[in-house]
């Protein structure tokens, strides 16, 4: 009679952490393997192929219409007048970080419509 996977899982669930560690060590010795994680050797192509999912919106300049930019900053971030003014005057500064591409593009459009220079990173 053979043991099923479910029976093995149930037996493991009933073990203490120390018993599981001892079991792993015994398996390493018996089969001549290591439980270390395998190293994936991917080039920079793999990183370039992944699409970026989080973006930062950076105000690079408030432009000629600082008042409109401050209003747009307040609407986008919920900051008070003093904080939004300080943000506009301390450009370049991150307006929002780790947001979706759609949200970043919408924020950039709003700020550019107010006269600001904006980058998405």
From Swiss-Prot:
Ribosomal protein found in the keyword field: yes
Top-level taxon in the UniProt lineage: Bacteria
InterPro entries, A to Z: Ribosomal_bL12, Ribosomal_bL12_C, Ribosomal_bL12_C/ClpS-like, Ribosomal_bL12_oligo, Ribosomal_bL12_oligo_N_sf
One record GO biological process: translation
Keyword Transmembrane helix carried by entry: no
GO cellular component: cytosolic large ribosomal subunit
Pfam families per UniProt: Ribosomal_L12 (PF00542), Ribosomal_L12_N (PF16320)
Gene Ontology MF terms: mRNA binding; structural constituent of ribosome
Similarity field: Belongs to the bacterial ribosomal protein bL12 family.
Record note on quaternary structure: Homodimer. Part of the ribosomal stalk of the 50S ribosomal subunit. Forms a multimeric L10(L12)X complex, where L10 forms an elongated spine to which 2 to 4 L12 dimers bind in a sequential fashion. Binds GTP-bound translation factors.
Function, as annotated: Forms part of the ribosomal stalk which helps the ribosome interact with GTP-bound translation factors. Is thus essential for accurate translation.
UniProt protein name: Large ribosomal subunit protein bL12
Organism: Shewanella pealeana (strain ATCC 700345 / ANG-SQ1)
């Amino acid at each position: 009679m053979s043991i099923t996977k479910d029976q093995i899982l149930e037996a493991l669930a009933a073990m203490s952490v120390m018993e599981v560690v001892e079991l792993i060590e015994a398996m390493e010795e018996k089969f001549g393997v290591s439980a270390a994680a395998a190293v994936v050797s991917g080039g920079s192509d793999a990183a370039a192929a992944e699409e970026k999912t989080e973006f930062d919106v950076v105000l690079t300049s408030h432009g000629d219409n600082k008042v409109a930019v401050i209003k747009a900053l307040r609407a986008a971030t919920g900051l008070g007048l003093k904080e939004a003014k300080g943000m506009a005057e301390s450009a370049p500064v991150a307006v929002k970080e780790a947001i979706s591409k759609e949200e970043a593009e919408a924020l950039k459009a709003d700020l550019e419509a107010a006269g600001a220079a904006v980058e998405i990173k």
